[in-house]
């Protein structure tokens, strides 16, 4: 279990919060110096998401409202979610990022319904509000228990035919702790196990293509 890597929970969360307070509020900052992969990432995410938005019949996922978790300055909100949804809510632990988002998003930012400044371990989505809850590059900042609990709360936040998407780094064998930003990169089988523990069913899994060889494999998981 990856939580064995977390010796002190308070320190685990506090160290991460301090790390992000010192990151510049830019796309490059959000991506740890890999701002150049943003377009490839967003194009892959759009393709993955649209298979649910374009489904025929009664299983189609709606496009009224999405939630961007660990939203930062709004990189995903701006380029992926606002073009596809009528309203987007954003949640992030760093107040400076959410303040920057208001200028970064430009005119379309008027369609952001709520800016929530909160750690995901303490955040509860409004029940029955969201068609899509997008959780990218942030589950490593939650312990296993807090991730399972957060996913359970997210499930309650979904509208009919709504989905939760996790997109994150994974390893193929053992989970790895990053002491710099205080995060865990989990093995892929553990991610699947924690999703199942939360009472969710995986609908689709896809590896992001065309990323640099030196970074971890990145997978998207859709579930409800």
Swiss-Prot record:
Distributive alpha-N-methyltransferase that methylates the N-terminus of target proteins containing the N-terminal motif [Ala/Gly/Pro/Ser]-Pro-Lys when the initiator Met is cleaved. Specifically catalyzes mono-, di- or tri-methylation of the exposed alpha-amino group of the Ala, Gly or Ser residue in the [Ala/Gly/Ser]-Pro-Lys motif and mono- or di-methylation of Pro in the Pro-Pro-Lys motif. Required during mitosis for normal bipolar spindle formation and chromosome segregation via its action on target proteins. This is N-terminal Xaa-Pro-Lys N-methyltransferase 1-A. Its EC number is 2.1.1.244. Belongs to the methyltransferase superfamily. NTM1 family. It is an enzyme of class 2 (transferase). It catalyses: N-terminal L-alanyl-L-prolyl-L-lysyl-[protein] + 3 S-adenosyl-L-methionine = N-terminal N,N,N-trimethyl-L-alanyl-L-prolyl-L-lysyl-[protein] + 3 S-adenosyl-L-homocysteine + 3 H(+); N-terminal L-seryl-L-prolyl-L-lysyl-[protein] + 3 S-adenosyl-L-methionine = N-terminal N,N,N-trimethyl-L-seryl-L-prolyl-L-lysyl-[protein] + 3 S-adenosyl-L-homocysteine + 3 H(+); N-terminal L-prolyl-L-prolyl-L-lysyl-[protein] + 2 S-adenosyl-L-methionine = N-terminal N,N-dimethyl-L-prolyl-L-prolyl-L-lysyl-[protein] + 2 S-adenosyl-L-homocysteine + 2 H(+). GO terms for cellular component: cytoplasm; nucleus. GO terms for biological process: chromosome segregation; N-terminal peptidyl-glycine methylation; N-terminal peptidyl-proline dimethylation; N-terminal peptidyl-serine dimethylation; N-terminal peptidyl-serine trimethylation; spindle organization. S-adenosyl-L-methionine binds at residues 70, 75, 92-94, 120-121, 136. InterPro entries: MeTrfase_NTM1, SAM-dependent_MTases_sf. It comes from the Eukaryota. Its main location: nucleus. It comes from Xenopus laevis. Keywords: Methyltransferase, Nucleus, S-adenosyl-L-methionine, Transferase. Gene3D superfamilies: Vaccinia Virus protein VP39. It is found in: Nucleus. PANTHER family: AD-003 - RELATED, N-TERMINAL XAA-PRO-LYS N-METHYLTRANSFERASE 1. SUPFAM superfamilies: S-adenosyl-L-methionine-dependent methyltransferases. One of its GO terms (molecular function) is N-terminal protein N-methyltransferase activity. The keyword Nucleotide-binding does not apply.
